[in-house]
């Protein structure tokens, strides 16, 4: 007689996707992806026809870039910088951070920095060839074309430089184009631009990545020639001179004196390259997940670090410090231009500097920044929120301080003030996606999730989730064009964190009107559009997965009464004829599990979607079609949660997966994927399904060889592999208990020797896998019909029944 399993360790299991899945990405804090286009601000020359034409080109190029991004929304899950890749309108005069007017936005100037010139002996020498200066106005594209025409791509000739003068809108600018240096590691061209000498402050103009392909098309040059082997981009400021170097690999130390000179005056790095070098095309690359923490993002294949824009003060005694910046955060006494500059300085100092984040908190800078969120000035709001976003990155204390509005608070202090700050933040977030980076970081803190659910859930659902998803009008996702995709993606990222807040948080989110409906509608739309790898779909499925956790136990009363009433009546009638085996008899279990589900609503609403057949098919479609590991894991995990238990909902979902939707075919394929987390979740789903007596033979026929194949030949050592092996053994145990034929099939697969090896485990300190293997062996010996077959296969009774296996089996009954 087979040994029955228990509802203990080998019973049903559930999962929930919280921020723990991001542990290998360095932090549970999720940062908002930086804006993909750079703001080119200015004020002069508005009537110039050439300028007007350039402005139109800019608008067209930015529109094409946005469309390009929306066409690859199924790309990577980017964890990028929590600071923008540029500094917004930081026009600073020396000494006191006073704001000034910005140049023309349509000039497309690459940069304007002051105090240009080379130092003898510390930088490049005077070029050996020159071009006569051109006095007429030229666009920067024409100027760059003429400069590049003097370069060649030969690597064996000596260093050669071309120097020329150009006038952009009557302002002189110098371009120096060099071919290469004798060192073979420098195989690419570099462009060094010297700004007009009369400029008094460093002013950066970077070309948006979306403009680069258009630029090289206009130059009739091959983009691949200049980008496919580029590797690394260096931009360094030397006494007000900006050097742009396109090199293959890192800059060798022996050339650093020429380009990254440490002169007597302070050097400010404007743009640092990635620390790793790779040959990258300017086109968007494949499905690799960035391994960076903050500060590095991929934009059209180029590796960028954040822009650090600082003022080169003529008086070293007035150098900006954190203390001075925090003291300037007073909207009543300090000009807004200085406040914006001070907030930007804090943003830069707190970027990847945990000491700076802690110092700002100690200086009481966070409450001052929070007060500035109310200032009706776009520059100030952008700078303040950028500073807050960096301050809370990977710093739970700062997150609590931001939300609750004061330092070292308790749960009873500052609630009202915090709510006010949060509401202001939600309003700002709805106006500009930049502010969503702050919300995303805050949502990763377990201490703040409940407060964010209370304060932000309804606003974000009504203003972002419902409009963008197209529900309830029935539009396809993104069809209405009312919102930018990045806004929807980042809001779903916030809700993904919030949905792991615990039972109370899950109940509130399930009750939120329109939330579940919109998430389901969006995911179904992406599947219909053949976009199962859409990155926002991953967030949506993770939210639904979390909301399905402990669903049966947390159902609202009105649903539990209607669903379980029929089940209670059948169970009462069955108890009258229970045999000597009590409620554990097979007859009673089959009657219990064959209880029909109440008729499904044709138009489900809210929580009803979570167990509806349409959503079950949606999960199976994503398992079959998506190549994103987290999407697969969340879909499998949602089904695992829904099949955990023996009530009407788990039983109905299990029958639907196995018998109606051919779900075993898709699930067994997930046992052989490379991602160990996906494999573990697939085994856990099979473990839950195998608890249904009426489905066991079908499951064994479909998946038995696959389950045996994933059991390792040796004792597993990693936690994930131990969990996977234990679930596989418990699944086999469920399938073997009541079926002599299934046990014989297991013997014929040749997997018994592996199970015995794992059962022995680590001697007197067995792990979960060895315990599960011992339980399985003890159950197999209960099939007396197979004793002779075991002996013919050279197995003895002591291989199945011994002190170790008996102890493991009996422990499940206690």
Curated annotation (Swiss-Prot):
Gene3D superfamilies: Leucine-rich Repeat Variant. Keywords: Cell adhesion, Cell junction, Cytoplasm, DNA-binding, Methylation, Nucleus, Phosphoprotein, Repeat. The modification Phosphoserine is found at residues 44, 82, 130. GO terms for cellular component: adherens junction; cell junction; cell tip; cell-cell junction; cytoplasm; desmosome; intercalated disc; intermediate filament. GO terms for biological process: adherens junction maintenance; bundle of His cell-Purkinje myocyte adhesion involved in cell communication; cardiac muscle cell action potential; cardiac muscle cell action potential involved in contraction; cell-cell adhesion; cell-cell signaling; desmosome assembly; desmosome organization. Belongs to the beta-catenin family. This is Plakophilin-2. It comes from Rattus norvegicus. The lineage of its organism: Eukaryota, Metazoa, Chordata, Craniata, Vertebrata. The gene is Pkp2.
């Amino acid at each position: 007689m087979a040994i029955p399993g228990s509802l203990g360790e080998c019973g049903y299991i559930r999962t929930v996707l919280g921020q723990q899945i991001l542990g290998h990405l360095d932090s549970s804090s999720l940062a908002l992806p930086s804006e993909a286009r750079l703001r080119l601000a200015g004020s002069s020359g508005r009537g110039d026809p050439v300028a007007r034409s350039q402005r139109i080109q800019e608008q067209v190029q930015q529109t094409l870039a946005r469309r390009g991004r929306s066409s690859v929304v199924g790309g990577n899950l980017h964890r990028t910088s929590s600071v923008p890749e540029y500094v917004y309108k930081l026009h600073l005069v020396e000494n006191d951070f006073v704001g000034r007017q910005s140049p023309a936005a349509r000039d497309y100037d690459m940069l304007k920095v002051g105090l240009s010139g080379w130092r003898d002996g510390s930088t490049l020498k005077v070029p050996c060839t020159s071009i006569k200066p051109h006095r007429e106005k030229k666009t920067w594209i024409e100027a760059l074309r003429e400069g590049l025409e003097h370069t060649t791509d030969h690597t064996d000739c000596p260093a050669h430089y071309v120097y020329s003068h150009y006038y952009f809108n009557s302002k002189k600018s110098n371009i120096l184009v060099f071919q290469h240096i004798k060192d073979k590691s420098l195989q690419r061209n570099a462009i060094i631009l010297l700004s007009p000498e009369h400029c008094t402050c460093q002013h950066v103009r970077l070309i948006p990545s979306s403009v680069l392909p258009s630029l090289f098309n206009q130059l009739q040059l091959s983009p691949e020639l200049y980008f496919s082997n580029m590797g690394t981009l260096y931009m360094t400021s030397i006494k007000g001179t900006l050097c742009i170097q396109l090199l293959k690999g890192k800059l060798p130390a022996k050339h650093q004196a020429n380009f990254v000179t440490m002169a007597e005056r302070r050097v400010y790095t404007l743009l640092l390259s990635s620390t790793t070098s790779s040959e990258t095309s300017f086109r968007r690359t494949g499905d690799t997940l960035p391994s960076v923490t903050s500060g590095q993002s991929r934009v059209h294949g180029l590796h960028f670090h954040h822009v650090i824009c600082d003022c080169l003060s003529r008086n070293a005694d007035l150098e900006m410090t954190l203390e001075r910046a925090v003291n300037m955060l007073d909207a009543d006494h300090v000009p807004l231009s200085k406040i914006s500059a001070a907030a930007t300085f804090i943003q830069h100092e707190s970027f990847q500097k945990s000491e700076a984040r802690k110092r700002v908190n100690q200086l009481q800078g966070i409450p001052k920044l929070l007060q500035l969120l109310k200032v009706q000035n776009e520059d100030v709001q952008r700078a303040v929120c950028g500073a807050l976003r960096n301050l809370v990155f990977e710093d739970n204390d700062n997150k609590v301080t931001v939300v609750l509005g004061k330092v070292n608070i308790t749960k009873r202090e500052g609630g009202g003030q915090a709510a006010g700050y949060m509401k202001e933040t939600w309003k700002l977030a709805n106006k500009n996606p930049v502010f969503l980076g702050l919300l995303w970081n805050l949502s990763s803190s377990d201490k703040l999730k409940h407060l964010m659910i209370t304060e932000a859930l309804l606003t974000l659902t009504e203003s972002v989730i419902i409009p963008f998803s197209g529900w309830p009008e029935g539009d396809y996702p993104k069809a209405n064009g009312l919102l930018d995709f990045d806004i929807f993606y980042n809001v779903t990222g916030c809700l993904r964190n919030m949905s792991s807040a615990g039972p109370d948080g899950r109940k509130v989110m399930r009750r939120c009107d329109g939330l579940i409906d919109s998430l389901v509608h969006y995911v179904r739309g992406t599947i219909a559009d053949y976009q199962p790898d859409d990155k926002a779909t991953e967030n949506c499925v993770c939210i639904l997965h979390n909301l399905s956790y402990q669903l049966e136990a947390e159902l609202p009363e009105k649903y539990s009464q209607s669903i379980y009433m029929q089940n209670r009546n059948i169970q009462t009638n069955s108890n009258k004829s229970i045999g000597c085996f009590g409620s554990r008899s097979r007859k009673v279990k089959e009657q219990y599990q064959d209880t029909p589900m109440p008729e499904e609503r044709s138009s489900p609403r809210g929580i009803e979607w979570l167990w509806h057949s349409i959503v079950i098919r949606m999960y199976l479609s994503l398992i079959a079609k998506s190549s994103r590991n987290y999407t697969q894991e969340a879909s499998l995990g949602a089904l695992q949660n829904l099949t955990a238990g023996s009530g009407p909902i788990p039983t109905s979902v299990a029958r639907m997966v196995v018998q109606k939707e051919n779900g075993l075919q898709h699930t067994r394929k997930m046992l052989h994927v490379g991602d160990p987390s996906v494999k573990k979740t697939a085994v856990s789903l099979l473990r839950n399904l195998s608890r249904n007596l009426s489905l066991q033979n079908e499951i064994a026929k479909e998946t038995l060889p696959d389950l045996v194949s994933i059991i390792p030949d040796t004792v597993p050592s990693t936690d994930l592999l131990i969990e996977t092996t234990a679930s596989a053994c418990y699944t086999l145990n469920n399938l073997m208990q009541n079926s002599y034929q299934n046990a014989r099939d297991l013997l014929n697969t040749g997997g018994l020797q592996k199970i015995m090896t794992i059962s022995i485990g680590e001697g007197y300190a067995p792990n979960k896998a060895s315990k599960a293997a011992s339980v399985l062996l003890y159950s197999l010996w209960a099939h007396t019909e197979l004793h002779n077959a075991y002996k013919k296969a050279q197995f003895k009774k002591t291989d199945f029944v011994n002190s170790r296996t008996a102890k493991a089996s009996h422990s499940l009954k206690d």
